[in-house]
């Protein structure tokens, strides 16, 4: 199992979340929105590993400098905070200097997509949104329905939610009172 920790300075829970990870010796910690050496060192101290979400080369370089164990390339089409680079170009760029494990995410939803990710050079294909609608998911039923009923036309790439660009569904933005003029 793993835990995702957003390490951006606006996340006031980082230290508390990290302490829980240490207490329970969480084997995999996924970080995003900042690469923090202290967090990596702490997770490594109990034998855990850290993978870091990246959308650009400079993010990968920073994560590599702090000693992460692998990178998650969050490419165009990924849900939530995501980049605009297509998977083919980003994986080629990152593999040109990075030799540790690479996970590819973004628009991966079936076996063909997984095979394509592996063919491009990813070590692992990462599907997230696809699993929100499984019966084991604790996601809100209205959220599950929104995903099922939405189309590609409902995906909005915007920074209006957190200040960091990401892909969000139009109905979720509208439910937050964020209308098209703010996208």
What are these regions (language model features)?
Residues 1-101:
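Active-site entrance/lid segments in N-terminal catalytic domains of soluble metabolic enzymes
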Residues 87-103, 109-183:
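Conserved active-site-proximal phosphate/metal-binding subdomains
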Residues 53, 106-107:
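Conserved acidic functional residues
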């Amino acid at each position: 199992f793993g835990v995702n920790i957003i390490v951006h300075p606006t996340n006031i829970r980082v230290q508390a979340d990290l302490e829980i990870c240490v207490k329970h010796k969480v084997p995999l910690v996924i970080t995003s929105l900042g690469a923090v050496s202290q967090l990596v060192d702490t997770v490594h101290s109990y034998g855990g590993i850290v993978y870091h979400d990246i959308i650009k080369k400079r993010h990968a370089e920073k994560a590599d400098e702090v000693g992460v164990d692998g990178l998650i390339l969050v490419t165009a089409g990924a849900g939530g905070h995501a980049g605009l680079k297509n998977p083919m170009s980003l994986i080629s760029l990152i593999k040109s200097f990075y030799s540790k494990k690479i996970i590819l995410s973004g628009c991966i939803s079936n076996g063909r997509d997984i095979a394509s990710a592996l063919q491009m050079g990813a070590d692992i294909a990462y599907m997230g949104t696809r699993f929100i609608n499984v019966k084991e998911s604790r996601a809100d039923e209205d959220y599950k329905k929104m995903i099922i009923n939405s189309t590609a036309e409902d995906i909005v790439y915007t920074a209006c939610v957190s200040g960091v660009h990401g892909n969000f569904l139009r109905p979720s933005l509208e439910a937050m009172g964020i209308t098209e003029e703010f996208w």
